[in-house]
């Protein structure tokens, strides 16, 4: 089975489950903001040190995959070699997403954004996932939380995020770092045009990807 197709089905199931667990008024207040997984990987161990999401463009998907290399277990050093990387096509462009140190670059790539430091978590296994989010003005997600963090790079429009700390906004071409695990949130289109965004997750792979939450 195509892994991205399988992931997309999981995303649809998650959105459906959230909708079933929340009152109908949650969806009636605005159109749903749709998210679709475009890349993911699971790892048993994360690189050491503060980690940043690095977003880069490449001319072709093959070039991005070749530049990414492999994140492989080395029994001699009892650790992983390389940096965990994901490749995907979105909005007519090829992206390479790397979880690594601040200020690094990938040969052949054009840096688009760097987001971090990513709030750390401890888990038996980690899921790194990139979602493509989209929605018209007024669209929003149900109130939810993750067992990890999510970071945003907005492609078009204006993104809003409501948490117990308040409301934050991100314009196209800009980023927003994630919160600590368990943060209740609502993500919504805060502009007058269609919103599209790349959303990078680092979460506990042994727990549900997303769960309903309550905002004050």
Model feature map: region roles:
Residues 155:
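A cytosolic small-molecule/anion-sensing beta-strand core signal
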């Amino acid at each position: 089975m195509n892994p991205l197709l399988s992931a997309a089905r999981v995303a649809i199931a998650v959105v459906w489950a959230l909708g079933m667990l929340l009152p109908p008024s949650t969806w009636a207040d605005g159109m749903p903001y749709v998210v679709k997984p475009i890349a993911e990987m699971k790892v048993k161990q994360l690189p050491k040190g503060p980690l940043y999401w690095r977003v880069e463009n490449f001319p072709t998907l093959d070039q991005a995959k070749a530049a990414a290399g492999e994140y492989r277990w080395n029994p001699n050093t009892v650790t992983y070699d390389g940096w965990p990387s994901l490749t995907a096509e979105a909005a007519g462009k090829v992206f390479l997403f790397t979880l690594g140190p601040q200020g690094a670059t990938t040969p052949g790539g054009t840096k688009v954004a760097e987001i971090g430091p990513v709030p750390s978590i401890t888990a038996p296994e980690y899921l790194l996932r990139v979602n493509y989010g989209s929605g018209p003005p007024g669209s929003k997600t149900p109130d939810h939380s993750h067992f990890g963090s999510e970071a945003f790079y907005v492609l078009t429009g204006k993104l809003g995020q409501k948490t117990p700390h308040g409301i934050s906004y991100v314009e196209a071409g800009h980023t927003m770092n994630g919160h600590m695990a368990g943060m209740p949130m609502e993500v919504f289109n805060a502009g007058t045009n269609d919103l599209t965004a790349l959303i990078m997750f680092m979460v506990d792979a042994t727990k549900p990807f997303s769960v309903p939450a309550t905002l004050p």
